[in-house]
Structures are given as C-alpha cells and as structure tokens.
Amino acid sequence: RGQRDWREQVDIGAEREAMPRDPLSPAWHRLRGPNQWPAALPGMRGVILRYQAAASALAIRMLEAFAQALGQAPNVFEQIYTPEPHYLLKIIRYPGRDRTQTDQGVGAHKDSGFLTVLLQDDQPGLQVEHDGGWIDAPPVSGSFVINVGEVLELASNGYLRANVHRVITPPAGSERLSVPFFFGARLDATVPVLHLPPELAARTRGLTVDPLNPLFHDVGRNHMKSRLRSHPDVALRHHADLLDAQQLEAAQAQA
C-alpha cells in the first residue's frame, strides 16, 4: 500500500449521460457520464459496448448462482442492480521489470462491486492472499477468473469474503495484458444484509475490519471510496474536496 503501481490502463464505464452536479449532489454523481472514445479507433466503441453487455449477462448469471448458494431466490440482488447497474471495464497493460522501478503491478486490494469477471492473457502475475501469504492464480486458457467483491461480502455479512489480490510485475522483456470487468449495484442503492439459512448464518464471520478500507452499505459511497484510494493523483486534481486529511496527504505524496 502507498507504493506507485506500474501499469497502463484505459477505464471505460457505462455509456450514460452525466448527472447534474451542485453543492448538494451526492459525491457518486461524479462516477457517471459518457466515455471519451478515441477518434483514431472508430470501431472501439461498438466492440467495447458489446463486450460490456455480454460480461454483464455473465455477471448476472453468476450472481443468481451465488444467491441460490446462499439459500436465496435467484433474483434477490435485482432490487439493488436494476435498472442501471454500475460497472467498469479496464484494459490494462503491465510492462516487464526492465521498464519499471518496483515489482508492484497493482497493489493489494479488494474490488468494490458484486464481482469481477477477469479476462487475462497467458502471462502469470495475479496473486491472491491466503493465510497471511500469497498464492498464484495462473491463467487457464479459455476461462475467466471471478473475484468476489465487497457488495457480496456486505450482503452475506462476511460469509462470502471479497478476496484481497494483487498483480506482480512480469519478467523483463515481457508484458501482461488483462481486461477486468467490475459489475456492481446501482450507485443510489443500499446493500441489504441477507437472512441466511441457519447452517450458513452460523458460519458468517462478520465484515472485514480495515481502517484503511472501510466497507459501506451505501453503494455510491463505497465505489467513490475505492476510486479515491486507487487513483490518488486523479483524486487530488479533480476531487480534492472529497479527500479527508489522510487521503489528501497520500495523494500529495504521489502527485
């Protein structure tokens, strides 16, 4: 934590109109708006929007499976993601060690939404925290990696845990490409705590306690928290009014 990541990425959210902003607007209004499509790649918009639609459909199928595994109706989560789920696609390139200053491709973190659908190339680098250490999650051809996010941890009262993961820099002379799709609830929604069957409720662990990454049932607040933490230099430039003293100090250190 607190180290500079070594990666290049393009963030592409849901293609929607920007929301009005005034001093009384919720901070999460800033997370919604149209994307900036490069004129040099005229076909990019259509390809990305089709991929987002397909990844959303897959994420919803996974959510229905999680819901049933938790003893709930398959559509239990619809109330907080319809009609406009919040989602984000990233296209990420991690350069090799000969072009970076540290081994940190991206630091240890959790994903803030329901779940993440991760497409990656054949270059290893993804690691998941387990029992105080790190285990590799090597690529498997023809598959996606599914990460549990903070919304599922909140809804299940910790029965499901948002997994902490990171990416280490690939070897010199190589690079790593990945395309994570983060599927979340509506920004104006509040995450309910599900009434789990007794046999599952007895095994809940409560929410993870981390002063540097508190979990909020307010979906918009939880997403904004993650964005401010993930991109402190951007936060300082465009959202300094939202930073607390600790966040402001961290952002200034990376500016």
Give residue ranges: language-model regions.
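C-terminal flanking tails of non-heme Fe-dependent oxygenases
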Residues: 1-3, 31, 42, 49-50, ...
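Non-heme Fe(II)-dependent double-stranded beta-helix
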Residues: 1-51
